[in-house]
C-alpha cells in the first residue's frame, strides 16, 4: 500500500487551454481604459507554456472635456516560464515574454475634433513586445483563474510606447 497524497495531473506537456482575459489599461483610474483578449496556450516541460492569442486595447486621452480614443488590435506569440508553485499544483506563478504586432487607430480614423482641431496622430501598423507576470489558480482540473500584470511596449504608432495592464481571466483546459 502507498501512503501519502495523490494530486491531479496538471500542467503536463501537451496539455492545451483556451483563455479569455480582460482588465484595465494604465491602472484603474478610468474604466474607459480597458483590454480584452482570447488566447490558446500549451504546456511544455516543467509547467512552462507557450501562448498564441489576440487582444483589443482601448486607451482614452483627454482633450479639453472629451476623450480621444486610441484602439489597438494585436496578435501575440509568447513563452511563459513557471518559477514558483505550491506542492499541490494549485497555484503557479509565471513570467513571460511575448512578441506583439497589429494595428492602431486614433479617434477611429477621424482626424477632426469637435472644435475644429486636427489630430496629427495617424493610424498605423504597430509592433513590439510585452513582459507579463501571471498567477494561475486551479479551481478544478479543467478551470483555471488567471491574474496578471503586464507591461506592453509598442512602436510604430503616434502616441505613447508603454502601456501597463492589470487583468483577470479564465482558462479552460481542453485536453
Language-model region placement:
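Residue-level detection of beta-strand scaffold positions
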Residues: 21, 33-35, 41, 49-51, ...
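Predominantly the C-terminal beta-signal and adjacent terminal strand-loop region
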Residues: 57-59, 131-175
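Extracellular loop and loop/strand-boundary signature of outer-membrane beta-barrel proteins
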Residues: 23-26, 61-68, 115-121, 152-157
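A mid-sequence interfacial segment
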Residues: 10-11, 100-139
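Short glycine/proline- and aromatic-enriched beta-strand/turn motifs that initiate or cap beta-hairpins
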Residues: 7-59, 167, 171-175
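Gram-negative (and chloroplast) outer-membrane scaffold detector with strong preference
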Residues: 39-114, 172-175
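Residues that define the transmembrane beta-barrel architecture of outer-membrane proteins
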Residues: 14-16, 30-36, 67-75, 91, ...
Amino acid at each position: 500500500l502507498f501512503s501519502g497524497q495523490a494530486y491531479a495531473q496538471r500542467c503536463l506537456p501537451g496539455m492545451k487551454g483556451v483563455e479569455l482575459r480582460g482588465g484595465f489599461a494604465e491602472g484603474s483610474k478610468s474604466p474607459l481604459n480597458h483590454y480584452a483578449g482570447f488566447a490558446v496556450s500549451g504546456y511544455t516541460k516543467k509547467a512552462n507554456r507557450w501562448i498564441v492569442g489576440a487582444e483589443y486595447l482601448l486607451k482614452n486621452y483627454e482633450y479639453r472635456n472629451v476623450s480621444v480614443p486610441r484602439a489597438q488590435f494585436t496578435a501575440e506569440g509568447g513563452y511563459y516560464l513557471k518559477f514558483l508553485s505550491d506542492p499541490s499544483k494549485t497555484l503557479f506563478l509565471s513570467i513571460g515574454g511575448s512578441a506583439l504586432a497589429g494595428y492602431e487607430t486614433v479617434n477611429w480614423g477621424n482626424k477632426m475634433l469637435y472644435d475644429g482641431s486636427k489630430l496629427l496622430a495617424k493610424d498605423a501598423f504597430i509592433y513590439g513586445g510585452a513582459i507579463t507576470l501571471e498567477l494561475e489558480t486551479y479551481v478544478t482540473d479543467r478551470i483555471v483563474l488567471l491574474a496578471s500584470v503586464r507591461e506592453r511596449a509598442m512602436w510604430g504608432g503616434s502616441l505613447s510606447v508603454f502601456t501597463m495592464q492589470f487583468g483577470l481571466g479564465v482558462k479552460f483546459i481542453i485536453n
